[in-house]
């Protein structure tokens, strides 16, 4: 009975299969936690979603920014990008079922017994655990409602970038979504910086990685996150694990076994084409 964590899959189905076979994952007794960004950039997003859905209650997922973007494309809010390789998923006969299943997934997972917290990008030092749970619940509630397309319209905004209990409901949703799915750096006062994507030793002053600022949550929980592939799983404090190691970019898919803290990595099968191009997709299984 083991607990496994896997970093961002990004449609890398073959690598996912290989790493699960390597640890002899058994969905009847083991639990698999996934850091989000299940889809896009890799070649097999459809197969990844189908596989994860079949695993049922043995899997605990959080949504990443690419998963939310996929929902925005499916609803016709955003245009599909050829580099995401998601047309087979968007036009599949079971696309609607998969999209509905996806939007019912959480943005935060917490195991209070093991004292583990998982979010795709991380947790802002401005929150305590109760605020984090409340903000996650607000996002999950709107995603599961009929008005979720209206919410998806706003997920590309960078403001507000500072937490306050006085924020409006819409502003709370935007800030929380950026924390859970897009955040990397903060200013010393906790204010989010949504622009810098460099590795920490190249980031301009006074920016700090979110995990290097004092936090009541970090003091009490181990934190698992993905999103930040350029970290290569390194440079985080004790008890904080960054598991995105850029499989879709020709890097590796990373698995952490919680019980012995052993790290297993599977090399990407090939480097992906980073050239950005676009294909018009107008939602609900239609493409031009």
UniProtKB/Swiss-Prot annotation:
Q: What is its EC number?
A: 3.6.1.41
Gene3D superfamilies, A to Z: 3.60.21.10
**What GO MF annotations does this protein's record show?**
bis(5'-nucleosyl)-tetraphosphatase (symmetrical) activity
Q: Does the keyword Zinc apply?
A: no
Database matches in Pfam families: Metallophos
Q: Which UniProt keywords apply?
A: Hydrolase
Q: Catalyzes what? A: P(1),P(4)-bis(5'-adenosyl) tetraphosphate + H2O = 2 ADP + 2 H(+)
| Keyword hit for Hydrolase | yes
Any coiled-coil ranges, and where?
A: none
**Which family does the record assign?**
Belongs to the Ap4A hydrolase family.
What does it do?
A: Hydrolyzes diadenosine 5',5'''-P1,P4-tetraphosphate to yield ADP.
User: What name does this protein carry?
Assistant: Bis(5'-nucleosyl)-tetraphosphatase, symmetrical
Origin organism is Baumannia cicadellinicola subsp. Homalodisca coagulata
- Classification lineage: Bacteria, Pseudomonadati, Pseudomonadota, Gammaproteobacteria, Candidatus Palibaumannia
